[in-house]
């Protein structure tokens, strides 16, 4: 259901720009079609009023024409059709078609042109009924003019009704389908882009934190390595100091041993002398 309410597009910034452009164009088109629909509705109402007036006028004119034709028939008898056909040489009334532009819609209009220079009924009815014939001719000229106007209004009414219906369908489709779908698509793309931005921000934070941890680990390793080097140097220094001390100790021990040897040798010598003296003394006695 959600896919039907928006366009199936890939959420990128280029697509977002395209959708915004399409939305702006749809809103502009909706505004123009709305104005066109209002202009067509106004003209349509005018045509409806003109049709009503033309129909009423047509009813009155045709009623008068029927009475005048009855008067001509009563005055001249049943030969009126034959006499009129024999009198007419050139057409006096001509109907021309034009087009009226209403908001880009071309409506057909009809106009009646009356050529006053042509009068084939001057000698018709000289014997009797000439006045009734002239009156009937004028009445039927008005009837034809009214018919032409009514035909023009009816044609415009039919064509304008179809165009107005089609325009209203377009306006409704743009207003209720196209614009909401584009708006939903834009909201979807913006939400997806925001989600991608949040993911990128989180990813960057993690990368930054990983780099900081790596830098801390490197600094700790360097400190430990530097501390081990200092300890080794101190050990070497202490070892170098111990070696002379050991030599000194050895010398002291040697001196002590030498002193012991000297001390013990002296008493032994005196004892031997005493023994010799005693032996000598014994020998003397």
Curated annotation (Swiss-Prot):
Coiled coil: none annotated. Transmembrane segments: none annotated. It is found in: Vacuole membrane. Disulfide bonds: none annotated. Residues 271-285 have a biased composition (Acidic residues). Pfam families: ATP-synt_D. Belongs to the V-ATPase D subunit family. This is V-type proton ATPase subunit D. It comes from Schizosaccharomyces pombe (strain 972 / ATCC 24843) (Fission yeast).
């Amino acid at each position: 259901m959600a896919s039907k309410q928006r366009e199936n597009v890939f959420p990128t910034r280029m697509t977002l720009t395209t959708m915004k452009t399409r939305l702006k164009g749809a809103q502009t088109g909706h505004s123009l079609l709305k104005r066109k629909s209002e202009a067509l509705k106004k003209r349509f109402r005018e045509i409806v009023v003109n049709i009503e007036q033309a129909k009423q006028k047509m009813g009155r004119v045709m009623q008068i024409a029927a009475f005048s034709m009855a008067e001509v028939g009563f005055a001249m008898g049943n030969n009126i059709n034959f006499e009129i056909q024999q009198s007419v040489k050139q057409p006096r009334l001509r109907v021309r078609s034009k087009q009226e532009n209403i908001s880009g819609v071309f409506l057909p209009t009809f106009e009646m042109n009356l050529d006053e220079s042509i009068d084939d009924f001057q000698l018709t009815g000289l014997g009797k009924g000439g006045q009734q014939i002239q009156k009937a001719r004028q009445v039927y000229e008005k009837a034809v003019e009214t018919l032409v106007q009514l035909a023009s209004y009816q044609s415009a009414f039919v064509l304008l009704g179809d165009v107005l219906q089609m325009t209203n369908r377009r306006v409704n489709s743009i207003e209720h389908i196209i614009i909401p779908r584009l708006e939903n698509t834009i909201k979807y793309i913006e939400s997806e882009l925001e989600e991608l931005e949040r993911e990128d921000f989180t990813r960057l934070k993690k990368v930054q934190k990983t780099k900081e941890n790596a830098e801390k680990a490197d600094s700790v390793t360097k400190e430990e390595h530097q501390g081990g080097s200092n300890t080794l140097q101190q050990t070497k220094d202490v070892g170098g100091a111990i070696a002379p001390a050991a030599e000194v100790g050895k010398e002291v021990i040697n001196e002590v041993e030498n002193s012991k040897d000297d001390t013990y040798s002296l008493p032994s010598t005196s004892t031997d002398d005493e023994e010799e003296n005693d032996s000598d003394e014994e020998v003397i006695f």
